[in-house]
Amino acid sequence: MDLITKLMVKPDSEDFPLSEFGLSESPAAEAVRAVFPNTALDPLEAQAALAFLLLKYRVSVSITMGPSFDFVYDDSQQFLADNSVINPPLAFDSSHQGHRSGQAVVWNRIYRVIDGLAALLQAEDFGDGTSMWDRTMIYVASDFGREKKRPSGANDWGTGHSVNNGVQVFSPLVPGDTLLGGVDGNTGLTYGFDPTTGAPDTGRTMSEPEIFSGLLGALGVDTSGSGLPDMPAMRRS
């Protein structure tokens, strides 16, 4: 089977005549469309669909994806009708000036896509009695944090950049339903955790090498000789 066919989500149709070019939809396309039905309009769903197929057919072992900055809406409905916005804007006005409301909308999209990917990967046999999801890690992070100051009484407000941040990891390879570290309720800033036990440590700030090493350890990568610290709290025992 050629690579184009393996990765083809769209079905053969009059508007998209694959058969005229000797092509066909992927054998997994129907299952993918059932989970991500809006790939034609939703750039995040389209990325997720392609990500699954790249993993399924062993074309790639690592995928980077994220919401588009573009404002996308379903123009088949009345202009900006309820639920017609497919991809909310993430450019300056939304990410800086309306950060809180923008985050609220985009988190829902990210979680839905993660849930869909997990479902598809769980149904995919790795070949040894385990599923592809059993060997997958989804790492959610931004390129920077946001300042934590809220103007008195404000429901929405502008934010500047901050080096203080947190990440989320979804995987059977890490301890589930677990918060490592925490957030100081007085400052909104994060604090760290004990690398061995995972116990919160309000006086500790985690370093990049520690988090990086913890992710590699959860994936089973041997970091001996690298100088990276051991982070057993970040991997499932």
Where are these regions (language model features)?
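Anion-binding catalytic surfaces of enzymes that hydrolyze or transfer phosphate/sulfate esters
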Residues: 1-128
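Feature marks hydrolase-like catalytic cores characterized by long aromatic- and Gly/Pro-rich stretches
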Residues: 72-73, 77-237
